């Protein structure tokens, strides 16, 4: 009996060690996600290993939440930065939305999971069309998840992008968009998209000098080595918005 228990414990330990090894591999792949990229497209083999390893690590209850967070985060990264054919987009977005929703239901207090879910749900709703998204309650769900997670970037974008529709969608408010996007930048000045989204709002407000100032501030931050692809694309968006504003000013 004693020998049996020792053997059983040994197998259990091996299982936990294997799962934790999967987590270690996955984290290493995530850290190296920009290596061997072509342009702003990540290496597909590394991304697949990262996703598969996080999924395997989820079997270890002791690291399940951390592994689940890594899993949905890596799926979101792959959707944004790994090349796939255009006809695959709908299936991949459907999968990202479903998986992140399940993860959010299990770990509703995890802010990283909530951010991915709100972002995926927002993109999913946008693909279905604004009216359908509103009727099915997708827009309100995005807002509610963002509020719970204090995700000011997603919340501010929702207030800015979504149309005010009396009796149907009465909560979008561009004054609140200003409040939340400003908060997002204040709380995380390292994320270039916080400069970009607030600059877009300033453009909409015809505050061109303020928009250009935000763009300059964002571009001056350079590129973070641990967010290389994300910041590289963020800089591209900032420069494109800068061109758009300058072209508008040149016409005056």
PLM regions: where:
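Short helix-capping/linker turns of helical repeat alpha-solenoids
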Residues: 61-64, 109, 190
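Sec-dependent N-terminal signal peptides
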Residues: 4-13
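Canonical tetratricopeptide repeat
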Residues: 70-71, 116, 154, 197, ...
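TPR alpha-solenoid repeat register
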Residues: 65-67, 113, 151, 194, ...
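A cross-kingdom marker for long, charged
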Residues: 200, 207, 216-252
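Boundary at the C-terminal end of the N-terminal hydrophobic targeting segment
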Residues: 17-21
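Short coil/linker segments at helix-helix boundaries
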Residues: 28-52, 73-109, 116-147, 155-186, ...
